C-alpha cells in the first residue's frame, strides 16, 4: 500500500514539473547539472559575491527564460566592490562577514523584494582565503553564512558560500569568456583560451581534444583534476584548467622579496624604502641604492617559477605542472585581470579600451625602460599606476609568466581583456557570470535540494 502511494506521489511530481525544452538558443548546460534549454523563468536574478584576495565584489545578473542576459537597472549587470578582501580579516570572522553588508544593500536596490526568496546568492572565495589556512577560512565562511541567512532575504544554501576550487574558478572564467564571445556550440578549436592573473593565484584554461584529455595525468585524491568536462550549447568540451596557487600578482611579490639575497631587492625602483604586506605578513622591500636591475630581477623571477622542476609527464609548464598538451584551443589566447590592468596603466594599451591586442615582448620592452627609473620618476612617467615602486617587478613577472611559465613566444599575439562587448553592453570577463548561469537553472537547484 505504501508503495502505491509512493508511485502516485512520484507521478504527481512529474506532472507538476516544468518540461525540459530542447532549444539551440539556450546559453549553456553543464552535463549532469544544467539542462540546456530548460526555462529559467522570466526575470530570474542571481547575486554572486566574488571574494578575492584584494576585495569582495558583488555581481547581480538577470536572465530571461532562455538564459539570455537582461538589463539590471540601466546596465546589463550591477557591480560594486568593497576593500579589503575577506582574508584580511583572518582571526576576525565577524568583521569579515559584516564587510559584505554594503554589497547586500547594493543588491537589494535592484532585485525586486518579491523575488528575493527565489534569487540564489552565491559566494565564491578565491586564492586569498585559500592561503590563510582552513581553520581561519572556515570561521570566516561560517560567519558569512550566518550573515546571509539572518540579514538577507535571498535564497540560502550553505553550500553556495564556500572556497571556490581553482579548477572551478578557471573553468567558469573560460565559460563566461567564450559565452560572451559567442564561441560556444561549435568545435573546441574555435574557442579561446584564457590566463587570469589574480592577487593570490593564476589560472590557465583552454579546451583540448578528447584524445588529449584521455592522456591527462592522474592527480592525488583531494586535488583538482586537470580536465573539467562541460556540456555547452549542445557540445561537449574538455577544458584543461589549472590554478597555480601562490603565483598570483601579490603572492609573487611576497615570494620574490622573501627570497632576495641580501638586504636590498633587485626588483624595486630606486629610492624606495619600506615593507610589502601580504596576508598579514610583512616583507622588506627596500630598493638597492642603484635601483632595480632588470637582468638580476628576471633571474630571481624565473627561479621562483621553477621552470626546471621535475616533470612527470611529457609536457609541463612550470613547477612540474602538466600544461594540457597545447593545441588549437590555446591558439587564440586572452589574458585578463592583472595583465590588463598594468598594460592599461602604463599606457601600452588604451585604458579606455575593453580589450586590446599586444604581445609578451611589449611587457619586456616596458620593463627594461621602467627598471631604470626612480620611484619619483615613475610617478611622473606613469601617473595612473598605483604601486609605482613595484612596477619593474610586476612587469618582469608578467612577462616571465607568459614566456617562461606558459611557454608563449615573445612575439605571439595575445588579447588583453577587461570586458567583452556582448550585444550593446560591455561585460566583465570573469567567473561570476558562469556560476550565475548555473545558479538560475531550475533543474540544478532541484537536484541540489534532493541530493
From Swiss-Prot:
It comes from the Eukaryota. One of its GO terms (biological process) is nucleoside diphosphate catabolic process. Its cofactor is Ca(2+). One of its GO terms (molecular function) is nucleoside diphosphate phosphatase activity. It catalyses: a ribonucleoside 5'-triphosphate + 2 H2O = a ribonucleoside 5'-phosphate + 2 phosphate + 2 H(+). Keywords: ATP-binding, Calcium, Glycoprotein, Hydrolase, Nucleotide-binding, Secreted, Signal. InterPro entries: GDA1_CD39_NTPase. Its EC number is 3.6.1.5. Residues 1-22 form the signal peptide. It is found in: Secreted. It holds the Pfam family GDA1_CD39. Belongs to the GDA1/CD39 NTPase family. One of its GO terms (cellular component) is extracellular region. This is Probable apyrase 3. Glycans are attached at residues 275, 315. It comes from Oryza sativa subsp. japonica (Rice). The gene is APY3. PANTHER family: ADENOSINE/GUANOSINE DIPHOSPHATASE (PTHR11782), APYRASE 3-RELATED (PTHR11782:SF82). Gene3D superfamilies: 3.30.420.40, Exopolyphosphatase. Domain 2. ATP binds at residues 47-57, 193-203.
